[in-house]
Swiss-Prot record:
Major localisation: host cell
Entry keyword annotation includes S-adenosyl-L-methionine: no
Sequence ranges of Polar residues compositional bias: 28-38
Identification of the protein by name: Protein E8^E2C
UniProt GO MF annotations: DNA binding; DNA-binding transcription factor activity
Keyword Ligase: no
Alphabetical GO biological process terms: regulation of DNA replication
Keywords, in A-Z order: Host nucleus
Family under the similarity heading: Belongs to the papillomaviridae E8^E2C protein family.
Location in or out of the cell: Host nucleus
Recorded GO CC terms: host cell nucleus
Top-rank taxon, per record: Viruses
Amino acid sequence: MAILKWKLSRWHTSDQISTTETADPKTTEATNNESTQGTKRRRLDLPDSRDNTQYSTKYTDCAVDSRPRGGGLHSTTNCTYKGRNVCSSKVSPIVHLKGDPNSLKCLRYRLKPFKDLYCNMSSTWHWTSDDKGDKVGIVTVTYTTETQRQLFLNTVKIPPTVQISTGVMSL
């Protein structure tokens, strides 16, 4: 305490230093408007990071994300996918590649030169409710057409340790 008094006395006179009283917290306009307990203060000079309306998605040309929101699945008479009775107007053919997660990661990097043969490729993921205990990784690949999917499967060499499942996805 004596060192603090000595340091402060070098810049201030002794009547400005109070050793027995505590200082009142100073408030600013920003702290008066918002509760500071448990919340972050918003920076006014930056745009709101939660507002995604200014960014356009790069997936607009893909069949998976081009379906308008709010509509449910409906039956169509000209549905090309015979595996289901109910088809959406916008479905995307997919392939699930299943196997060891590290092998799938390496396969994803090996498939980058073939990106014109697919629309989107997911990161390696797995089902969390799997009771078996083995962590089989899954990579989902989407296509714009079934022809593109077939061309991908005919062109790309998939390792024999990776299981291939085909299907469709609608959002």
